[in-house]
């Protein structure tokens, strides 16, 4: 599965001048989907988008974090149970999926949607043992 993600990331093209998505556009595009994201040709993470702007994020390590998103000053901001500091992004819809720019800063992290896999993401339970 990771190989499929990496192949899709390698062929993702950067759109010319796309317009930032509104909260309504973002919700309409993402709700009910599980999307993989990549950066610089490598898998970065996966997010499941639920009703009422709830999300579940993982860095593909089996550790999943519940959160919510909201719009603030033209950006889509995420707050997770394990991190109360908002993580704000602008999203554009390119020809091959979403493009996310951290804090709308062209020099900051940029992520590309790899695909909607149409299946559940892997989340391990809490650490248990002796």
Give the ranges of each region predicted by the language model.
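Sec-dependent signal peptide recognition
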Residues: 1-8
């Amino acid at each position: 599965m990771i190989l499929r993600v990496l192949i899709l990331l390698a062929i993702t093209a950067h759109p010319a001048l796309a317009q930032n998505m509104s909260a309504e556009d973002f919700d309409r595009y993402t709700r009910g989907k599980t999307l993989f994201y990549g950066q610089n040709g490598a898998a970065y993470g996966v997010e499941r988008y639920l009703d009422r702007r709830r999300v579940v994020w993982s860095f593909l390590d089996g550790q999943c974090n519940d959160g919510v998103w909201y719009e603030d000053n033209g950006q889509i901001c995420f707050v997770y149970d394990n991190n109360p500091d908002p993580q704000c992004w602008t999203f554009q819809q390119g020809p091959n999926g979403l493009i996310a720019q951290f804090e709308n800063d062209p020099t900051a992290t940029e992520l590309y949607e790899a695909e909607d896999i149409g299946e559940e993401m892997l989340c391990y339970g809490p650490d248990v043992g002796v």
